[in-house]
């Protein structure tokens, strides 16, 4: 077993080797991604690297069941996404993506809050560069800058929380944090912003779809799931996460149903699925924590598959709206099948990975007698089938004949989708392959007759509801307003209004000072006789003091008010 070799090192080495002439840069990155994945499989549980820094104990490297599971899926999806991205012309995007992945792996292997924060900020920089590298999209620059601002805000909040927490607790080791002081709440807020929790959830749908066909796949896997890891590590059992999770679940469903853009549908679906994970973390039992971890693992796989199928459509047609595509199953059958498998997995269809993972969270709520939470999770499962399980494949691959006849995407893209499709089914049929990675040895059997029948009935009625409501679900060329309107448009309007008010008051005070100046000058001219000579000039001290007093009073009023 391997103790101290950090998987991120090989990804960073891959980036360095891309600057060497005569090397095939993409194959070099692919090779180092493979090495990093193989290394993650052999990380030794209990391995750590400790360091003393400014009277604090830093733990730069910590391997346990939770962190190793996340490292395995992070390196695995990096390898598969790299296969998918072999046709990506921008080497800058791939370098940025590997920096991004390295930072995410560093974050989940950090055993202290300072190391976590450093990797957290590097992750924000890397992901921003992934978005900005899509120079063919005129919207990517502004979306990337908004994305960066939101994550810098989250980073500042997290930094203040960590500094305050360290000053009180005299300890920065990253373990379960109690919400008994304001600084722990700030740390929680920093994590939730990156998780895509309202009111900042809009950054996911604002930024991810503006990346390239391959960049979106990388982005979907790491930022929100690193936050899920951090919440598991620091705030498992915090009831407030249940409520945040439920809001995210239904927020994602509603906006995904309203959306017309293919990848924005799937971006809102990310928020929805992370909401399920937050509910599991908030419940805080061994079963629900296991469920949150496995669901994060499975979600990375099937969400990447869905985004790869959507990216393949966009890559081959240059169309990204549901209203512009349809009937693509005729010429893109493999992409269609892979997209359907991803849709079934996200819908928790039996024999797929979503069924064996999400059900642990739902069952965790039932076992804790959280009846209202259980009902909402069941209803939300039907909602997921509506927007991602049926809407996405129906409008993109079936429904109308758009007249488009694109070919299948390049073979490397097909290979990546086929691998992910296989994994969705593999973990659905053999869930113990995933369960053996979990931190808690909690027996869970997903395939009971009651559970399978109930889930099939739920999906059947949700499917019927979709086709009954189909006339109302057909998309038009509309724009969906989200919370980001508040800072994209509302904040700008507010600042412009403030600027105008300040400008008007500046003019008013300027006129007032001019009037005072004229008044004082007149007093000086009257009091100072220039005709009798310098030696005979005299000054009326009382008038001068009066004028200065008026000026001082006005100056104080301006300063105070």
Language-model features and meaning:
Residues 56-58, 323, 400-404, 524-537:
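Cytosolic juxtamembrane amphipathic/interface segments immediately preceding
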């Amino acid at each position: 077993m391997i103790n101290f070799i950090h998987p991120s090192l090989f990804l960073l080495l891959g980036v360095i080797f891309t600057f060497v002439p005569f090397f095939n840069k993409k194959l070099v990155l692919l090779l180092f991604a493979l090495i990093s994945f193989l290394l993650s499989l052999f990380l030794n549980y209990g391995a750590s690297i400790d360091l003393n820094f400014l009277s604090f104990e830093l733990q730069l490297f910590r391997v346990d069941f939770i962190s190793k599971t996340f490292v395995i899926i992070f390196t695995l999806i990096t390898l598969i996404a790299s296969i998918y991205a072999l046709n990506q012309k921008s080497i800058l995007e791939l370098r940025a993506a590997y920096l991004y992945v390295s930072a995410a792996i560093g974050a989940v292997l950090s055993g202290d809050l300072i190391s976590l924060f450093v990797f957290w900020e590097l992750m924000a920089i890397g992901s921003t560069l992934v978005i900005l590298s899509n120079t063919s999209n005129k919207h990517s620059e502004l979306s990337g800058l908004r994305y960066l601002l939101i994550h810098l805000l989250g980073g500042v909040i997290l930094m203040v929380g960590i500094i305050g927490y360290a000053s009180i607790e005299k300890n920065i080791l990253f373990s379960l944090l109690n919400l008994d002081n304001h600084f722990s709440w700030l740390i929680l807020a920093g994590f939730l912003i990156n998780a895509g929790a309202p009111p900042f959830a809009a950054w996911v749908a604002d930024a991810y779809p503006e990346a390239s066909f391959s960049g979106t796949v990388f982005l979907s896997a790491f930022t929100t799931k690193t936050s899920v890891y951090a919440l598991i590590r620091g705030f498992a059992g915090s009831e407030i996460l249940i409520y945040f999770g439920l809001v995210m679940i239904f927020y994602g469903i509603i906006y995904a149903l309203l959306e017309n853009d293919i990848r924005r549908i799937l971006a809102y679906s990310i928020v929805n699925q992370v909401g399920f994970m937050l509910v599991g973390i908030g419940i805080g039992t061994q079963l629900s924590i296991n469920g949150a971890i496995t669901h994060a693992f499975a979600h990375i796989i099937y969400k990447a598959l869905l985004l790869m199928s959507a990216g393949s459509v966009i890559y081959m047609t240059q169309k990204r709206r549901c209203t512009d595509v349809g009937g693509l199953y005729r010429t893109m059958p493999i992409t269609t099948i892979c997209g359907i498998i991803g849709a079934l997995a996200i819908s928790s269809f039996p024999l797929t990975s979503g069924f064996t993972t999400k059900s642990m969270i739902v069952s965790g709520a039932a076992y804790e007698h959280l009846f209202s939470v259980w009902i909402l999770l069941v209803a939300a499962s039907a909602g997921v089938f509506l927007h991602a399980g049926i809407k996405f494949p129906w409008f993109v691959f079936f429904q109308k004949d758009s007249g488009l006849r694109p070919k299948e995407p390049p073979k490397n893209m097909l290979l990546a989708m086929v691998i992910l499709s296989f994994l969705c089914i593999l973990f659905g049929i053999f869930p113990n392959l995933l369960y053996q990675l979990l931190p808690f040895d909690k027996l869970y059997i997903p395939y009971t007759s009651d559970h399978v029948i109930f889930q099939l009935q739920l999906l059947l009625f949700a499917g019927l509801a979709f086709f009954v409501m189909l006339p109302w679900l057909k998309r038009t060329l509309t724009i969906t307003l989200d919370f980001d309107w508040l800072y994209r448009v509302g904040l700008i309007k507010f600042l412009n209004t403030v600027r105008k008010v300040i400008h008007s008051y500046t003019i008013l005070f300027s006129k007032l000072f001019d009037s005072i100046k004229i008044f004082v000058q007149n007093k000086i001219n009257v009091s100072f006789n220039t005709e009798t000579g310098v030696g005979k000039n005299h000054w009326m001290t009382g008038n001068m003091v009066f004028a200065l007093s008026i000026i001082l009073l006005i100056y104080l009023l301006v300063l105070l008010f």
